[in-house]
Amino acid sequence: MNEMLFRTLLKRYEATIEDCLYKIQSLSENNIVIPEHVDITGEADKLLQIMAEAEDKVAVMRKYYVKNKADKNVL
């Protein structure tokens, strides 16, 4: 995988994680209720699933596409 593709995907997955963290924080702190998403725990569970998938993808990328341990620590 070339470096530009690697970094682009990494940023995508990191942005997904940040987005989910923000949404979970908003749900819990601001008591925001979205009419079509009244099940707050269900919505938080969906967001956690999305985060887990993004983290798994980052881990796979680091495992298979980072050349050495020093590079893995930088990312």
Which residues does each PLM region occupy?
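Extended, charge-rich alpha-helical interface modules
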Residues: 1-75
